[in-house]
Amino acid sequence: VLSPADKTNVKTTWDKIGGHAGEYGGEALERTFMAFPTTKTYFPHFDLSPGSAQVKTHGKKVADALTTAVSHIDDLPGALSALSDLHAYKLRVDPVNFKLLSHCLLVTLACHHPADFTPAVHASLDKFFSAVSTVLTSKYR
């Protein structure tokens, strides 16, 4: 459960990311593919080479979904319902992949904003990404 302090940390951090969210989303997705090669199986039609336009485009979609989640932090299930349906029923993404991507998002954000990435912010973002992952996998059951 996200505390009021967690919500503030997430919103403040996301505001600082600003227009770089899409760039960071692409970088995190690329990092996920490199660190966890099994995640590539969901993208057989993509050029997965470093700097790929397809990976960057999908990374922006991930970032846009997270921006929506931040904007609706008090109603993640409502905000992400359609995305949950897509991943559960159509794409059938293994739930563990959300955790792997979340980890790579944390690493990417820490690399770009080391001064802002305090232990409290790290914990808040980790809890937020976990909450988003829980919503995205809620319809698997």
Swiss-Prot record:
Entry keyword Membrane: no
The Globin domain is annotated at 1-141
Residue numbers carrying N6-acetyllysine: K16
Which residues of the sequence carry a binding annotation for O2? H58
UniProt KW keywords: Acetylation, Heme, Iron, Metal-binding, Oxygen transport, Phosphoprotein, Transport
- Mark the residues carrying the PTM Phosphoserine: S3, S49, S102, S124, S138
Taxonomy, superkingdom: Eukaryota
Any Gene Ontology CC annotation: hemoglobin complex
Q: Where does heme b bind?
A: H87
Known InterPro entries for this protein? Globin (IPR000971), Globin-like_sf (IPR009050), Globin/Proto (IPR012292), Hemoglobin_a-typ (IPR002338), Hemoglobin_oxygen_transport (IPR050056), Hemoglobin_pi (IPR002339)
Tissues showing expression = Red blood cells.
Name a biological process GO annotation: hydrogen peroxide catabolic process
Q: Any idea which residues bear Phosphotyrosine here?
A: Y24
- Spell out the CDD domains in the cross-references: Hb-alpha-like
GO function term, MF aspect, one: heme binding
Q: Which residues carry this modification: Phosphothreonine?
A: T8, T108, T134, T137
Q: Which residues carry this modification: N6-succinyllysine?
A: K7, K11, K16, K40
Family stated for the protein in its record: Belongs to the globin family.
How does this protein assemble? Heterotetramer of two alpha chains and two beta chains.
Function according to Swiss-Prot or TrEMBL: Involved in oxygen transport from the lung to the various peripheral tissues.
- Name of this chain's protein: Hemoglobin subunit alpha-1/2
Task: Tell me the organism.
Answer: Leptonychotes weddellii (Weddell seal)
